[in-house]
Amino acid sequence: MADISDRLEVKVVSARSLSEVEGGECNPFAVARCGSEFGQTLVANRTTDPEWQSSTMIFVDIAENDVDHIVLNVMHKNLSAQADVDLGAAIVDLRTAILSPGIETDEWYALQRAPGMD
């Protein structure tokens, strides 16, 4: 088990103005990845402005594993048999986002659109 100093709490609050998907309904969810660890929000049904208010703990030794960023992917949950659709991703640079243990940052991050979502 990782030491308490090796934990990173990631809170995904919301998104706004997400791309509509083919068929018109968007069922977005977010996946936060840091190194090999990840956490995921629940699916917000039929909205392009989801409110997740979701927290996850990621246990990773940032220095030991040479981890310097979190990747946040926003996906559309495809309710049919097809694969989920990537709506875009944001990269959070931990070198500038984390000032010291116990400090929270509250920022909006723009999604870089996934290929084919123009």
Roles of regions detected by a PLM:
Residues Q40-R46, I58-V60, R95:
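Beta-strand-rich interaction surfaces with strong enrichment in secreted/lumenal proteins
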Residues P50-I62, V92:
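Exposed aromatic-hydrophobic patches
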Residues M1-D3, V60-A63:
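Extracellular and analogous surface-interaction loops
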Residues R16-E25, N65-D118:
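C2-type phospholipid-binding modules
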Residues I4-P50, N78:
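Calcium-regulated, polybasic anionic-phospholipid
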